[in-house]
Structure formats: C-alpha cells, structure tokens
Amino acid sequence: MKILISIPRKVNFLLKNISYIVFLSSVSFLLCYSLGKCNLGIYEGTYGIGLCQVSPSLLPAAASSPPYVVAIDPGHGGTDTGALAIVKEFEVIDKTAARLYELLEDDPDFIPVMTRTDSDPESAQRATVANNAGASLLISIHANSDSHKSSKGFECFAQPPGRTYHQDSYRFAQLIVAQMSAAGHHIRGDEQKTGIKYAYYYGNDKKIVDSSDSQVRSRKSFGILEKTNCPRVLVEQCFITNYSDVERWATDDGYNQAAQLYYAAIKEYFKEF
C-alpha cells in the first residue's frame, strides 16, 4: 500500500517508547510502504517534515538551516532524583528545561526535543532520542552540590579536546558562560574563570580539569557528551547546597532567567553557524 502524506513545516512530537525520525524543511512528502507489521521503506523529498519509525541506518543529518532541532536533556528525572539538598536537583532541572522548551517552541527557527519525559533512561537512550531527531545542538541541564556550603556558581562541561565536535561544543559553552556572567552569576574555574571544564572517568573515579588543560585524553567523559552526534554542553546551573545560589537560580524567577540565558546562547550559536 502506497501512502502520500503532507506534513506542516514545524510540528510538536513526543518521543516515548519508540524512536521517530524527523526530516526537516518546508513542504514535501513522506512516502511509506507498509507491509505486515510496520515494515517501512522511506523516501523523503528535498524539503519536508515527516514522522516515521525507521532503522538507525536512516537517521537524518543535522539541519544546516532553520528550523534547527535543539535537544534539551534534563540530566535527572523519574526515579533518578539527582542530588537532594536545600531543593531537589530534578525539580530545578525539570522546571528550567520546561521553560527553555517553551521559549524554543515559540521561535520558528527551532524545534525543541526533550530527551526524557517522566522516565529515567540511561544517557545512551537519551542520546539516541537526540540523534534520532536529527539534533543540531544539545544542552544537558544539571544542578551542582557540594559538602562545603560555601561552594557556589556556574560551570559547564564541553566535549573534551580531540573529540569530533570539541570546537563547536566549546564555542557553545563560551556563549552560555558569557550570558551567565553578564547576568551576574559567579563563574567558577581556574584563575582565568572560564567556567568551562572537562570530565574524564578512570574506572569509577572522575577527574575534572579546567579548559586550560587542552591535553587530548582517550578516557570517556559524561555519557551524554560521548554519545550524541552534535555539539553538546552539560551545564551545572547552580549549587543547590548554597543558599544564595538557590535563592537566585532555583526559584521560579531563577528558572525563567536561566532558561532565557540558555535560549539567548542558543540563538547566538546559530547566528554564528
């Protein structure tokens, strides 16, 4: 059976339990041949949006023109609550991510995708959601914690040196830090206070280095930074163990402001794209 489907340029879609593929542009067609239990062959026009379950071998390339798919990765959720301190990490993440999603959804240049909803998939599964959607950029949102209540401020993790998307990842991280710094957030880091770090795992031990350390290492970084096929940055929005950070960045006003700053950095990233 041959089916011709016309689909609008920008759609909202939910990725839950099954993976979908998104072909981006303005007007075109998606032609599916269905035999038995959803065995599909896919043919897509030069310009078009369609949704269809497909094999990983047919995943789309990231868009080189708007609308861009931006993956928002809530770093914790479901039964994975993250750190529990003055506030709960997953609540900071969830509310900030939801506000960022709304900002991107209202902008015709972007199609936002959440890598998780109310479940707790592993980082590899969340990366697959972003990859299947053809994400051009990913931001993974977290909140920090420390046994020392004086620890405060913003930092983020770029894809480490030597990786495919390191330079673009670092550029995106710089744009985020610039937004946070302009908003008055304390920027963490070495004497240069870049706010950008790299993470490496040596067995169960994690090593954090500042971005001034440009040594190429083969050790794996955070899972979401390793498995996503686009530039990506993991942000630590604030310390939920520090009262001043919580008051500024872990309230409704704080979630709104952080989302606005991430959105501004995303806009700037693609402006330079």
Predicted regions and their residues:
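N-terminal targeting leaders characterized by basic, low-complexity, disordered sequences
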Residues: M1-K2
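Glycine- and acidic-residue-enriched helix-capping/strand-helix junction motifs
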Residues: G82-K95
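Active-site-proximal helix/loop segments of hydrolytic enzymes
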Residues: P8-L24, S28-A62, D94-F273
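Catalytic-core environment of secreted peptidases
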Residues: A61-A85, I139
